[in-house]
Amino acid sequence: MCIRDRGYGEDEYCEAAREKIKTACQAPEADVHFLVGGTQTNTTVIAAILRPWQGVISAVSGHINCHEAGAIESTGHKVITLPTTNGKITAQQVQDYVEWHRNDESTEHIVQPGMVYISHPTEGGTLYTKAELTALYDTCRRYGLPLFIDGARLGYGLMAEESDMTLPEIARLCDVFYIGGTKVGALFGEAVVIMNENLKKDFRFIMKQRGGRMAKGRLLGVQ
């Protein structure tokens, strides 16, 4: 059967999927976009947020630092790593780093932190608690740093017995996150959920630039 519909993610299947995701997140105000895989999603979101002189704060064990073949650095952005023993970074670590950067006499010669990246679960399988994520997001907001949650395996994190967070709570405790499909049973596809109004404008342009707008985008929507 031949189906005639709009391309590039503007079809009825993608629109229906967007509405289902907004409902599940209890976030009717969210913008939802579909990309193919995790590395493409991470590079696209990070490129959309950072200015040319900025970098992204991550745990030293973070996925973007260890397992994406330098994808972020290849776009000209530094991954600013913080030490960790359990895969997580803390609100205090972010505060300490930003304060150090702002107060260093050579601050304008050092890559400026422009956002914070975490994954849930972390690269080692640990989970952020609601209290930890709340504290981290409060600190990010205080310093004007968008918080991005890599949710490639978010489904596993939310369903883990020790998890104390829901999908709507995740949505309220970050600026942008994605719901992974590829790593949790879908053929392919990740759903980017943008909560911060300031990050919504022109996102589809950066998607196109990064090769993320599929002509047959409905294949993502049906996942």
Predicted feature locations:
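Conserved PLP-enzyme active-site core in the AAT-like
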Residues: 4-222
